[in-house]
Regions:
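Internal helical hairpin/lid segments
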Residues: 207-287
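Generic beta-strand/beta-sheet core signal
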Residues: 41, 178, 206, 259-261, ...
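Active-site-proximal beta-alpha core segment in soluble small-molecule metabolic enzymes
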Residues: 2-141
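Active-site loop/helix belt of alpha/beta enzymes
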Residues: 98-230
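Conserved, mostly hydrophobic/aromatic
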Residues: 30, 95, 131, 175, ...
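Generic secondary-structure signature for well-ordered alpha-helical cores
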Residues: 58, 80-83, 87, 117-125, ...
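C-terminal accessory subdomain/extension
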Residues: 250-337
Length: 337
């Protein structure tokens, strides 16, 4: 989640169905920035969080908001709060299907059906508006693509069973999945349930917006190999996020210390990679980083950068780093250019 209002509005202007958030304070910021449709791809739990949500929905009944549920306890909590706050419209809920050893989400379709029935039993305070899953965590399984296809089949089966029992509310229903690794498989295998429901399919590949130079770039290359339509898209997804710093010390041969550290750039997946350099009193434009230069260690405020093939580096040279995992770089900055 970028938490950048200009980027949110650019996405919506370009046709994004909604903005996705993970918690209540992100929701508050979206509302402050005038976002009128939000999907919280998470459960809302805790007295204060549920109360804040109900106040927002009570005071702004036109706000189109969706959240996830994977337990009957949470459903009952939401229903009680909706009743207490006298909401004029029901809280819109998607049942979340998960998988064993995953994250949140009902561990099988039978459990998910119980949650769907509980939502139905709490009308008119709640309304079941669809089903949701997050398949990207299956990337670590021995056969990830097969595991994802099986999971999407279960997601389709859940939607079908809910439709057959008449548990969905009136109006269109939402089917949503699709992390940035496998959204092509979601588009291929996510199917609308039979019946008269109008269906909106929503993929949530949030990292498409900035992409990166490492992890998600590799995921996209794999996607191009397995999907001809993706490979034919030119130029495809390109990295759009760099973090720049300056060489502040060259304490020994082959080593440059750059003033970029863990407080400035993501490191939870991989260390950043130096991509460009610029000497302010010499270069007119940034130059491509010589091969062999790499970050070997990241401290709070500094990066150790091995420069075995380019001894000409000087203190004051600017270095542009490509990143791995945009989300945990965005959260380190209040302003980006």
């Amino acid at each position: 989640t970028t938490m950048a209002p200009q980027l949110f509005h650019r996405q919506l202007e370009d046709g994004a169905w909604a903005i996705t958030v993970a918690n209540i304070h992100q929701l508050r910021l979206c509302r402050h920035w005038g976002i009128n449709r939000v999907l919280m791809a998470n459960q809302v739990v805790g007295y204060q969080n549920i109360s804040d949500l109900c106040l927002e929905l009570r005071d702004n009944p036109e706000f189109d908001f969706y959240l996830l549920a994977d337990s009957c306890q949470n459903v009952d909590q939401l229903a009680e709060a909706a009743k207490t706050y006298g909401l004029s419209k029901p809280i819109q809920i998607l049942v979340e299907l998960g998988f064993p050893d995953g994250r949140t989400g009902c561990r099988n379709t039978d459990l998910a059906l119980e949650v769907a029935r509980r939502i139905k039993s709490n009308e008119p305070y709640l309304i079941l508006k669809g089903v949701e899953g997050y398949e990207a965590l299956l990337r670590t399984r021995p056969e990830p693509e097969d595991s994802i296809r099986i999971f999407l089949k279960d997601l389709n089966l859940l939607a079908e069973k809910i439709a057959l029992e008449g548990l969905f509310g009136q109006g269109e229903i939402i089917l949503t999945a699709g992390g940035s690794d496998f959204f092509d498989l979601v588009l291929e295998h996510l199917e609308a349930p039979s019946g008269r429901h109008e269906v909106v399919k929503v993929i949530r590949s949030g990292c498409y917006l900035t992409h990166d130079s490492l992890a998600f770039n590799r995921f996209f290359e794999k996607m191009k190999h397995r999907n001809d339509k993706v490979s034919q898209a030119s130029p495809g997804l390109l990295p759009a996020l760099q973090v720049w710093g300056a060489v502040q010390s060259i304490p020994e041969s082959g080593l440059a210390i750059v003033n970029v550290g863990k407080r400035d750039v993501s490191y939870d997946v991989e260390l950043p990679i130096p991509e460009m350099y610029f000497r302010p009193d010499k270069d007119q434009f940034p130059q491509k980083m010589p091969e062999g230069c790499k970050v070997t260690l990241l401290h709070d405020q500094h990066a150790n950068m091995a420069v075995p093939t380019f001894p000409e580096f000087q203190v004051g040279d600017m270095i542009g780093f490509g990143i791995s995992h945009p989300c945990t770089t965005f959260d380190k900055w209040r302003l980006m250019y």
